[in-house]
């Protein structure tokens, strides 16, 4: 349980009356050193996403960046709330999604933001999406049940009528900051702003193009040929009237959880830069304890399997998540010993001996092996295809395990037995992903070394 008073030692204190228990993924914080920045300052490690005891969900944030013009008018605030703190603050203090929106926007109003981001705040009844791109401006939308959009570090909000007060919460200065910056696009008299056009700037993104191709079921989009109308969300209809929030993305079918997982596996949405991926599956009806399923994956989603959790019932995580390992060593010169790889920028990274003892470590090691090779030895396209096939088969096993978990939880007759059934099942699935990944890594590492040895004999 988080203390309702939270301070980063920078003079800013967020204080509320209540504090709630929550389940969240976070980085290891061994010896009091934050692994995100390697410092000992007082903020918590990045709690990527999670759910609290009231059923409030907060997604991981997606970093956003306002243009130089708007930031010159309303710059980020050094002591403002940062992305690494949003999940911690909201989950410990909000009892509904709407309370979470009110809390976050009040912090933006009063303390400001240290950077821009987009974040989902949801409960069983409502889902809100909040974007901020400068120090004190923000726009929050209550989403309709059918809206589809994505946000690969690009503001997703297009033309928004701020008079839709049931579904829109906006900072009082949202239009005026853009006007002062000379970037405003919209109709100030009608209280309408195009947030993306006014604040965001460049929208070219290979990930956006890949996502549009996947969602539209086509292959025609590139980062150079799509426009805001292809992806942005809006509440302004063709005649200028306020309508439920929509986007122009029309899915070719009703998406399942597996379809959503495949979205994250689409390159370059899936890549070695992935750290954690969270997919919240929420039912608007039924027992809150089982209405929310959080699917999680670590590292590169191209080669991965997602594990389901009932966050309201989870009381522990698999032991393999709790392993603290030594640091990876980075160098500019090729290492002479150990297991290492060279990334696309020419930097060398050497693993500690215990790296694959942890869930994240072994996932990271296999991802880098498939992407960059190992000790100068490269894998083949056949190796990569085999890894994808292995994870696809594993995902099907996990889907079957998830069905068994749901049945076991439904059959349990006490809260404690439901918690045990859910926790044990999710931990077993996590262990299965770890075991499969370690086996794949060791086998492929040996194969690349053998190929290198044969090649040296031939030459």
Where are these regions (language model features)?
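A conserved active-site cap/scaffold subdomain adjacent to cofactor or substrate pockets
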Residues: 231-233
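A conserved hydrophobic secondary-structure block that centers on an alpha-helix together
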Residues: 84-86, 90-117
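Single conserved hydrophobic/aromatic residue that forms the stacking wall/gate
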Residues: 1-14
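Charged low-complexity "KEKE/polyampholyte" interaction tracts
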Residues: 301, 311-459
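Short beta-strand scaffold segments in enzyme catalytic cores
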Residues: 117-122, 127-130, 139, 276-281
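N-terminal accessory/precursor segments of enzymes
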Residues: 12-97, 133-220
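Active-site-proximal beta-strand/loop segments in catalytic clefts of secreted hydrolases
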Residues: 60-64, 124, 297-300
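Long, well-ordered mid-to-C-terminal structural blocks that present hydrophobic/aromatic surfaces
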Residues: 236-331
